[in-house]
UniProtKB/Swiss-Prot annotation:
It is an enzyme of class 3 (hydrolase). Residues 364-444 form the OCT domain. It comes from Corynebacterium diphtheriae (strain ATCC 700971 / NCTC 13129 / Biotype gravis). This is GTPase Obg. Residues 2-159 form the Obg domain. Gene3D superfamilies: GTP-binding protein OBG, C-terminal domain, GTP1/OBG domain, P-loop containing nucleotide triphosphate hydrolases.
């Protein structure tokens, strides 16, 4: 029998984004081809999807370290890098995704549901995408961003309509084996069942699912026995069925005391639950009592004697059956189906979320420094920390071995208002400023309060106005040298004489 795993810890690492490419178009007779570096591809995501073929988390248990594919780097000729392939993990219905701190991130309850557990990094821009009127031929590109890296906890909670609860060896596995096609392990010793078993009870025009939860003992809600690991499998059940051993011979135990002990554990477990399953409080869900093993001598007499007392004390329907002899099963099945149908009618329908409409709003220039925050560095004297999503992303994207890329970063930070904010905080030239994982000595490029001007880094002078001497101008200069004319006006108040023509003879 395959091992049942209902809790795993995954170490996820999404794909990194590919780096952008810095290249210039090279073609015969096209000296001014311009930048043509492509963008890097985005990194692959790690996606969890609910599959009806998955019934356990066993596959993920043996490979907890998962990494998605990296995005390809950009290339010349405007070729963008390929996107990294997503890593899709199939999980069974009822899987809950939690963070390391225990916060619920997603509840995957139905086939087809997906959740992006780790987002891939964005690819870096190539120099073709960075070109502008002020920076016509950038000699740099942006690096790709790293993908998300974190741990998540997956817990599987059975999606059953009815949950069978009871003390060990009460006959729960025997009951589910005769009511459905499930084939659980059956034995005459406690804790034979070490994993939940699910079965489908076919009632002709309808059907319902039933779960066999391993035996509970007093103190299960505090972790005694196997209870704490398996109590979560009854959180989603609409009906709880107490399976009671009517033939128990243990001193101090009887069907009523067994039911009371189990109810105390369920109440204690409910107080620790903070999840809304849309099924209501665990203590208020429908219940039935099943007095099993009525085929054993004296057990049937005891069950009939206690039936009225149980109904009067708890107010729940009581059924006397024998799973081994297959007696009393039909009335029990129809009663279970009736309770399940009532529960389905009462269950609130999920509300359709309102469509989110994004409406652009004007940005107040006076609030341009709201994208970051300047803090004093507690570890460095006269040091400052620049905290914000955008500045930290820009630091990751920058190739610090390229002076032009560093200049581009300085322009971006200046336009955002970082330099002005540092000056107002008291920072002066030479102070240590840390952004992300990079620390540097701050040298302000603009005075505080002055409008930032584009520096024009990366401008290709060949793309400016052509100042080369034309053929006609060379011809006239030759005439000057031969004495045919005294001078020639080149324009822009420049005069060519015999001496200057000889000096610039080979110009152009």
């Amino acid at each position: 029998m395959a091992r049942f795993v209902d809790r795993v810890v995954l170490h996820l690492e999404a794909g990194d984004g590919g780096n952008g490419c810095a290249s210039v178009h090279r073609e015969k007779f096209k000296p001014l081809g311009g930048p043509d570096g492509g963008n890097g591809g985005h990194g692959g995501d790690i996606i969890l999807t609910v599959s009806p073929q998955a019934h356990t988390l066993l596959d993920l248990h043996y490979r907890p370290h998962l990494k998605a594919q990296r995005g390809a780097n950009g290339a010349g000729d405007h070729r963008n890098g390929a996107r990294g392939q997503d890593l899709v993990l199939e999980v069974p219905a009822g899987t809950v995704v939690m963070s390391e701190s225990g916060e619920t991130l997603a509840d995957l309850t139905s086939p087809g549901m997906t959740f992006i557990a780790a987002k891939g990094g964005f690819g870096g821009l190539g120099n073709a995408a960075l070109a502008s009127a002020a920076r016509k031929a950038p000699g740099f590109a942006l690096k790709g961003e790293p993908g998300e890296q974190h741990d998540v906890i997956l817990e599987l909670k059975s999606m059953a309509d009815i949950g069978l609860v009871g003390f060990p060896s009460a006959g729960k596995s025997s009951l589910i084996s005769v009511m459905s096609a499930a084939k659980p392990k059956i034995g005459d010793y406690p804790f034979t069942t070490l994993q939940p078993n699910l079965g489908v009870v076919d009632m002709g025009n309808d059907a319902f699912t039933i779960a066999d939860v391993p035996g509970l003992i007093p103190g299960a809600s505090q972790g005694k026995g196997l209870g704490l690991d398996f109590l979560r499998h009854i959180e989603r059940t609409a009906v709880l069925a107490h399976v009671v051993d009517a033939a128990t011979l243990e001193p101090g135990r009887d069907p009523i005391s067994d039911i009371e002990a189990l109810e105390e554990e369920l109440a204690a477990y409910q107080s620790a639950l903070d999840e809304d399953t849309s099924l209501g409080d665990l203590r208020e869900r429908a219940r039935i009592v099943i007095l099993n093993k009525a085929d054993i001598p004296d057990a049937l007499e005891l069950a009939e004697f206690l039936k009225e007392d149980i109904e009067e004390k708890f107010g729940w329907p009581v059924f006397i059956i024998s799973a081994v002899a297959r007696k009393g099963l039909d009335p029990l099945k129809y009663a279970m189906l009736d309770l399940v149908q009532q529960s389905r009618k009462k269950r609130p329908k999920q509300k359709v979320e309102e469509r989110i409409v994004v409406r652009p709003q004007a940005v107040d220039a006076r609030k341009k420094n709201k994208d970051f925050e300047i803090l004093a560095d507690p570890q460095v004297e006269n040091g400052y920390l620049v905290v914000g999503e955008k500045p930290e992303r820009w630091i990751i994207q920058t190739d610090f071995e390229n002076d032009e890329a560093v200049g581009y970063l300085a322009d971006r930070l200046a336009r955002m208002g970082v330099e002005d904010a540092l000056w107002k905080k008291g920072a002066r030239a030479g102070c240590t400023v840390t952004i992300g994982e990079v620390s540097f000595e701050w040298e302000p490029t603009t005075a505080a309060g002055v409008e930032v001007q584009m520096s024009g880094r990366g401008t290709d002078m060949r793309l400016e106005r052509n100042t080369r001497v034309s053929a006609q101008e060379r011809k006239r200069a030759s005439q000057v040298r031969r004495g045919l004319i005294d001078e020639y006006d080149f324009g822009d108040d420049q005069k060519v004489t015999r001496e200057s023509a000889n000096r610039d003879r080979w110009q152009g």
